[in-house]
């Protein structure tokens, strides 16, 4: 059985895109669970097969392709497949954005090497499309692996929208190390968050929680959260300030 040590890249590897790593994951760890979402899961072999099948259905190159970034395995299959087909992924939070945002992409010249166009939330004005290159995705992933310790046996719970860099940036390192993603639909149902940590995957869990979600867990489920302390490798936070009091409570939960 191959381990995470076997997975370490050498100077002979020339993997330039997330999908290059996904293909390697499927070859090295075909039966490892890649993604879990509700009652559905898929291995790296199954994921890669779905991605290549979907990629074959695209007959364009270099085009911006919009899709609704629902919290599903199919969403990530579509995301990877768009890249694999040589097109640019435009994940949108809801279908109503299609006409407005796609008008913006049609007016733009998309340089070679662009993987995604991600739209900002518009908190400082109108929503803007930001181009993300394949090389940026890989660099982002490598930085997170080095700084936060993403590894092959880690399961990362994603609870945010897959149209947002905050969630997609956690997909990147997990694919590079051949770990597992667990997708849940937000944090409105705390039980789903804990059910994700009850899933029968090897290793430990990590997640990203905005400060409001941390406050919710500490207020309504601190004792329950403490029961999982030995299974949680780290909790990343950001997007807003977190109080010193909440940070201390989280550390000692």
Task: Tell me the role of every PLM-derived stretch.
Residues 23, 73-91, 144-146, 165-177:
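Hydrophobic alpha-helical segments in the ANL/AMP-binding
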Residues 11-14, 18-19, 23, 31-59, ...:
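Conserved AMP-binding/adenylate-forming core of the ANL superfamily
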Residues 8, 50, 69-70, 90-102, ...:
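ATP-dependent adenylate-forming carboxylate-activation enzymes
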Residues 43-44, 115-142:
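Conserved AMP-binding A3 loop
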Residues 40, 55-95, 161:
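Conserved AMP-binding/adenylate-forming
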Residues 70, 201-249:
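Adenylate-forming
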Residues 13-16, 30, 105-119, 126, ...:
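Conserved pre-ATP/AMP-binding loop-to-beta segment of ANL
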Residues 138-155, 163-206, 220:
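Conserved AMP-binding/adenylation subdomain of ANL enzymes
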